[in-house]
Amino acid sequence: MYRKILVPTMGEYMDELIEHTLDLLHGREAEVICLYVVDTSVPFLTPKKVKEMMVKELTERGKEILRDMEKGLTGPENPNVKFRGVMLEGNPADEIVKLAEEEDVDVIIMGTGKSLVDKHLLGSVSEKVVHYAPCTIHLVRTV
């Protein structure tokens, strides 16, 4: 059914995403690409040094999250999962859609992830991905 799965994550609700992905696979063979996007869209007046520190911290956090996702998705209990971690910089929604297109993924599994206030004011990443993704999307309710 699904041979290539994209799982974007910011680290929140990681367990739910792992569980949903493994449930969807039912032990079948698949490549799972976990994506962490370092969101570089900081307010315009943010000093360069502050932005650099933020990107560095987010990059370190991303490495840790991708390691944790790999541990949760692979191992002796999941021998049919081929894991690949990817870290990109940019706008999360844009990078998710772009990678889904480039990798020709079958499905994106992602959380809803933001509070109602954030969704109303900023729009959510998942909402943008739903509108522009080239494939099926499974949204995991995480709020």
UniProtKB/Swiss-Prot annotation:
Pfam families in the record: Usp (PF00582)
SUPFAM superfamilies: Adenine nucleotide alpha hydrolases-like
Disulfide bond residue pairs: none
PANTHER family hit by this protein: STRESS RESPONSE PROTEIN NHAX, UNIVERSAL STRESS PROTEIN UP12
Family, as annotated: Belongs to the universal stress protein A family.
Top-level lineage group: Archaea
InterPro entries found in the cross-reference section: Rossmann-like_a/b/a_fold (IPR014729), Universal_stress_UspA (IPR006015), UspA (IPR006016)
The species this protein was found in: Methanothermobacter marburgensis (strain ATCC BAA-927 / DSM 2133 / JCM 14651 / NBRC 100331 / OCM 82 / Marburg) (Methanobacterium thermoautotrophicum)
Protein name: Universal stress protein MTBMA_c15380
